[in-house]
Amino acid sequence: MLVKKLAGKGGGRESGSEDPRPLGQRCAGTMPSCTALATLLSVVAVAFCFYLGVKTNDLQARIAALESAKGTPSFHPLSDTVDELKAMVQEKVERLLAQKSYEHMAKIRTAREAPLECNCPAGPPGKRGKRGRRGESGPPGQPGPQGPPGPKGDKGEQGDQGPRMVFPKINHGFLSADQQLIKRRLIKGDQGQAGPPGPPGPPGPRGPPGDTGKDGPRGMPGVPGEPGKPGEQGLMGPLGPPGQKGSIGAPGTPGMDGQKGEPGSPGAAGQSGLPGPKGEPGKEGEKGDAGENGPKGDTGEKGDPGSSAAGIKGEPGESGRPGQKGEPGLPGLPGLPGIKGEPGFIGPQGEPGLPGLPGTKGDRGEAGPPGRGERGDPGAPGPKGKQGESGARGPKGSKGDRGDKGDSGALGPRGPPGQKGDPGATEIIDYNGNLHEALQRITTLTVTGPPGPPGPQGLQGPKGEQGSPGIPGVDGEQGLKGSKGDMGDPGVPGEKGGLGLPGLPGANGVKGEKGDTGLPGPQGPSIIGPPGPPGPHGPPGPMGPHGLPGPKGASGLDGKPGSRGADGPIGPHGPAGPKGERGEKGAMGEPGPRGPYGLPGKDGEPGLDGFPGPRGEKGDLGEKGEKGFRGVKGEKGEPGQPGLDGLDAPCQLGPDGLPMPGCWQK
């Protein structure tokens, strides 16, 4: 079949025709494929066998590990020897013997270590409490979303009759909806009444510039202008002479915590300290509590009576197995705190380290609040300029957009370093571990420093709102630009300013170099504290192995007489005794119970009217009532009167919806 299938794949031969090649050549062509297939199957079988061997070995290792973890010895008859079998059987027999002997032993109940606190379960839930008082009214909530559209209104009244057509006999049905233009040209009604003025439209686009108007009349001379704005910042002047030595400045605000420095190199070995005084001998410890008595052993069996002759001395018995190690006891209570040592001597002050490298430039800070400078003196009036020619009046410009806020100018260069200040106060503040009190004492030092340098110039304030248009003045002649005035004399130095605001915390400086190692301080006196109290008793250890039966005990002494027995049952009643003498008269009895109510009395006469009582106090405010239902929609009102005619020019509306004031006067 294989030969036929291979032969049937030929292009020009039919499926039913046979291959004309001999049988040897045909089989030789299929041998390589069969060999490759057999080789592939062999490789797959070998790989599968290897995989099964690895998995079996892994499974065997896991079973052995599980048996060793659970403590159940595995039984391998091929590898175990006779000695191992004996040891295994002996161990099982001993285990069974110990289990049986433990079952027949007297049960000893250990003392229960119950805690003093109650560990009872939670009780049933209580009854629901009374309703609390009404709380205060909360703040008004946020405005809710817009409600759904209201119901459709009532049908309007019928409109007035429209104008008559010009051609009433013409049927306009032939006109389609797309020929509205023809309708408007053929059917033109009378002019309707003027409608109400519409709302002011949006401002129109900017118109083209108008023609140059005629020269106006010559105006009056203009009002002197306002003093000019301060000029740009001038060049930096030469450095002045160094100022006088300033007083001690106030302590600055604590700076930001610097970054944690790298661990320093180990210091040099200090000088050996003086030997401390010999400590006093410790106090004698308290005597420990007596241990609990061990469980009493079982009574041994009665021995056989011994012979009168002395018995043979037996061999000494084997020593018992050592008991298991008890669990470690709980840690003892912490010892009493030691006596506070005397403060050590203050070491000499180390030499100041070298100044650190300047720090990197920090990020740009946020803009400060705008400064408020004092108003300067009015400048001297300049010379009167010549009257210029009147210029043509330009068109009115549109209102420009508000400009963006400009960036603050850069700070000036850093000034030269000042002279070295006086050394700070060397007051030693012993805070005794209370850092807060130490900081309070630092802040209470009354040291006033010189006033801080003037702050940088504030940013330009925002542009104010547009003022109302003023009275149009007469255009004066444009004067010539005056020459630059001479520099004025320096002003009188002002009074001493107040204390400046504390500056912003500076950027983190570069880590300074390591200072020299200070001299070792003197060694403080060594004080040995008293020994701590003994720790609590540890928990009782586990019960030891069962002891061997003890020897026969001696005959006991006679017991003590027992306690008195319980009373016996009551005997039968005896015969009746003789009649007694007559008794004395008894005492008077207690009053009897209250009798029934009497009949109601007659109605009394009406009494006099009483005086009017005082006016009662004002009652509390009642609770807020529930929200009422929505009212019925009212009837439609009468149509309003026609409004006024619209304005010629659209005016800008204000926030209240009305035109801006003064718009009609333009």
From Swiss-Prot:
Subcellular location: Membrane
Region of interest: Disordered: 1-24, 116-168, 189-428, 445-666
Topology term for the membrane: Single-pass type II membrane protein
InterPro entries linked: Collagen, Collagen_Structural_Proteins
Compositional bias (Gly residues): 494-503
Residue numbers marked as site, Cleavage: 112-113
TM regions (residue ranges): 34-54
GO biological process, one term: axonogenesis involved in innervation
GO cellular component, one term: extracellular space
UniProt key word Protein biosynthesis: no
Segments in the Extracellular topological domain: 55-666
Disulfide cysteine pairs (residue numbers): none
Extent of Pro residues compositional bias: 140-151, 196-208, 528-543
Tissue-level expression: Expressed predominantly in neurons with low levels also detected in heart, testis and eye.
Start and end residues of each stretch annotated as Interaction with amyloid-beta peptide: 181-188
Biased composition (Low complexity): 230-245, 336-358, 457-466
Alphabetically ordered keywords of this record: Amyloid, Collagen, Glycoprotein, Heparin-binding, Hydroxylation, Membrane, Repeat, Signal-anchor, Transmembrane, Transmembrane helix
Topological domain spans for side Cytoplasmic: 1-33
Post-translational modifications reported in the UniProt record: Undergoes proteolytic cleavage by furin protease to yield the soluble collagen-like Alzheimer amyloid plaque component.
Function description: Inhibits fibrillization of amyloid-beta peptide during the elongation phase. Has also been shown to assemble amyloid fibrils into protease-resistant aggregates. Binds heparin.
Complexes and interactors: Forms homodimers and homotrimers. Binds to the fibrillized forms of amyloid-beta protein 40 (beta-APP40) and amyloid-betad protein 42 (beta-APP42). Found associated with beta-APP42 more frequently than with beta-APP40.
Protein's UniProt name: Collagen alpha-1(XXV) chain
Lineage: Eukaryota, Metazoa, Chordata, Craniata, Vertebrata
